[in-house]
């Protein structure tokens, strides 16, 4: 049987990937401070994120409706179609994570609860139960043919596999030498390779991702949709998942491709949060103040063109004047020169 052991994460990951964790951790700390200072701005982001998360996670699985209809469902409308019932179930589970994350942990009961919440109105027999028969992960090719992408754990071995997965996760989570942002994607790979349900595995995995991020101290999923990012880059997401599941049954798989993909998605979420925050918080500011705020709030070096893109109503002349003044006042530093020049808050 598959062995679940994450001790390799102590020293088995390339150093350049380890550095990414430090960047993401800094971004997270920065936004925790922002959140206390700009409550209303983050509340607007929260309202937007719940819609995008519900839409994105279900859309990946071909479960769709209009954005307006999703808004109606979130506000209490009665679901009519099969898809709307599944969408509403995901919304309820996601809301539970956002409101009760301090009282939730990744466990067998919580995993089954998420599945039950999603499926009870469309498939009450299977809802909240592990798969009753073996299943395959299929891929539909452009020419209409099918191929088996992965052969998951058998139905009669699922309960034990989930138990061993959870024990390995608990053990690794307590080990201070194991970066939790490496542990989360490894857990997701293993969960999806087990594929414990006949339907809904992908959506449950995304709920677990958001919950595990909360547990690790990252509430990014409350303000920026992780599911939306996965949906927008789902080809690379599934390619990385397939690479990291190759050799899984023989304990020979390499988690690195999926770890890298996960960190890229997380970084994009923080970048989007930074941009969204600027859009909301700078609406009423003077043009020169908006340019300065963009520069001071940037989490990575940005170019003049980047500033123009963020502030299309601000003239190039105004941007250049602010840049020159901030350089003179030593508020920012210049990296590179001429067309490749980028600017960053001075440390």
Where are these regions (language model features)?
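FIC/Doc superfamily catalytic core
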Residues: 1-347
């Amino acid at each position: 049987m598959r062995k679940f052991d994450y001790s390799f994460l102590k020293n088995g990951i390339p150093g350049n990937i380890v550095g990414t964790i430090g960047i993401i951790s800094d971004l997270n700390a920065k936004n925790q401070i922002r959140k206390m200072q700009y409550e209303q701005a983050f509340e607007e982001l929260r309202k937007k994120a719940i819609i995008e998360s519900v839409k994105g996670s279900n859309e990946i699985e071909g479960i769709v409706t209009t954005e307006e209809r999703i808004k109606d469902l979130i506000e209490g409308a009665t679901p009519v179609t099969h898809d709307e019932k599944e969408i509403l179930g995901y919304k309820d589970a996601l809301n539970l994570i956002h409101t009760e994350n301090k009282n939730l942990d990744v466990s067998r009961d919580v995993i089954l609860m998420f599945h039950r919440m999603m499926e009870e109105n469309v498939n009450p027999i299977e809802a909240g139960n592990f798969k009753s028969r073996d299943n395959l992960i299929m891929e539909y090719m452009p020419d209409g043919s099918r191929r088996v992408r992965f052969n998951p754990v058998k139905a009669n071995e699922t309960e034990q596999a989930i138990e061993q997965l959870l024990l390995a996760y608990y053990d690794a989570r307590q080990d201070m030498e194991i970066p939790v942002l490496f542990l989360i994607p490894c857990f997701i790979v293993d969960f999806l390779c087990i594929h414990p349900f006949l339907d809904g595995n992908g959506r449950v995995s995304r709920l677990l991702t958001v919950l595990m991020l909360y547990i690790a101290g990252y509430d990014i999923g409350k303000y920026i949709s992780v599911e939306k990012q996965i949906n927008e880059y789902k080809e690379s997401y599934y390619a990385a998942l397939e690479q990291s599941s190759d050799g899984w049954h023989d304990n020979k798989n390499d988690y690195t491709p999926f770890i890298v993909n996960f960190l890229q998605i997380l970084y994009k979420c923080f970048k989007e949060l930074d941009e969204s925050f600027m859009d909301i918080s700078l609406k009423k500011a003077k043009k020169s103040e908006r340019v300065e705020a963009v520069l001071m709030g940037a989490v990575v070096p940005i170019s003049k063109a980047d500033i123009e893109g963020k502030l299309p109503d601000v003239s190039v002349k105004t941007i250049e004047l602010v840049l020159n003044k901030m350089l003179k006042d030593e508020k920012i530093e210049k990296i590179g020169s001429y067309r490749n020049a980028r600017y960053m808050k001075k440390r």
